[in-house]
Curated annotation (Swiss-Prot):
InterPro entries: RNA_pol_sigma_r3/r4-like, UPF0122, UPF0122_fam_protein, WH-like_DNA-bd_sf. It comes from the Bacteria. SUPFAM superfamilies: Sigma3 and sigma4 domains of RNA polymerase sigma factors. Signal peptide: none annotated. Transmembrane segments: none annotated. It comes from Shouchella clausii (strain KSM-K16). Might take part in the signal recognition particle (SRP) pathway. This is inferred from the conservation of its genetic proximity to ftsY/ffh. May be a regulatory protein. Pfam families: UPF0122 (PF04297). Belongs to the UPF0122 family. This is UPF0122 protein ABC2295.
Amino acid sequence: MLDKTLRMNYLFDFYHSLLTEKQRNYMSYYYLDDLSLGEIADEYDVSRQAVYDNIRRTEAMLEEYEQKLRLLEKFETRRSLLAELRKAIASDQAVEACNSLIDRIEKLD
């Protein structure tokens, strides 16, 4: 399992277009630029609690999008299968293993 920051960064990459501009800005400042709640609050002239609440709600939204669309899950599965494919190519049973992995990758979508 990915640590929370890395997971949120991935979810943000996949689903940022579904967020409002304010949500994108808060998440970007907090997770990508590593700004504190206080720094973000100063930038937007709001309370730290308002920033915290917005970020937590946005995190929940991103998790909900992932439950429905599973883009991160498919990405991780695809990456894992491609790593197996690279390993299989280097082995003796390359043809059978590669065909099997290709079939699994094709079934992801």
